[in-house]
């Protein structure tokens, strides 16, 4: 008796020797059937705009799947932040279903917003519109952002400058080969020149203006004295104290002088 080799395969020929040929014929028949379905049903693409930022791919897909079978779906997201841009593209298997969805859903109040739903003809649908639509979304990696914005050393900065200059040369060569006369600023900014030369020039001018060796003549000495006096006069600060009003009154009203005659009269009367 033959040993039991597990459950029977779904595509199994009556003659076990003809299994491989039978599978090939079956796959060809399935492909032809799919092509016939695609020829019968022309797909239609719908543009959805003014979408709330809180909606994700699963929410919009489940909502649109109520109208008919969806072939492809894509929600536009920012590559830098990963947030929704507020518009999406839905491809229905039937073009008639897509037109019905565009008519019914246009200006529909959804999440305090009026949706804009438009049917896109085949001429306006780009061939790369649904590229990587089946790939799940991954937010941008923040370690890569930190690595890009990190503080670099002197050697790392030199390597970056070398790479930028190399790219700039290649770009200029490509433009020259194509005959494009286009001038653009360099990718690496020129380093600012140090102000040593300007400082040296100022010192040289000041030394040149001075006399080489001043002669001690009487006119020169008088000039020096007058300069010193002006400096001392500027440095002096005179403080004036306010005069109290009581002293002024005392000065204005002097005390009366006592007369000696009155004293003598008093003594005589006592005697």
Swiss-Prot record:
Superkingdom to which the source organism belongs: Eukaryota
Modified how: Phosphorylated.
Signal sequence residues: none
InterPro entries for the chain: NIFK_FHA_Ki67-binding, Nucleotide-bd_a/b_plait_sf, RBD_domain_sf, RRM_dom
SUPFAM superfamilies: RNA-binding domain, RBD
MF (Gene Ontology): RNA binding
Stretches the record annotates as Disordered: 1-20, 242-271
Keywords: Acetylation, Chromosome, Isopeptide bond, Methylation, Nucleus, Phosphoprotein, RNA-binding, Ubl conjugation
Modified residues (Phosphothreonine): 213, 217
Pfam families: hNIFK_binding (PF12196), RRM_1 (PF00076)
Domain annotation RRM: ranges: 44-122
Chain residue numbers at which the record places covalent cross-link Glycyl lysine isopeptide (Lys-Gly) (interchain with G-Cter in SUMO1): 247
Sites of Omega-N-methylated arginine modification: 223-224
Principal location class: nucleus
Self-association and partners: Binds to the FHA domain of MKI67; this interaction is enhanced in mitosis.
Protein name, UniProt field: MKI67 FHA domain-interacting nucleolar phosphoprotein
Protein's organism: Rattus norvegicus (Rat)
Gene: Nifk
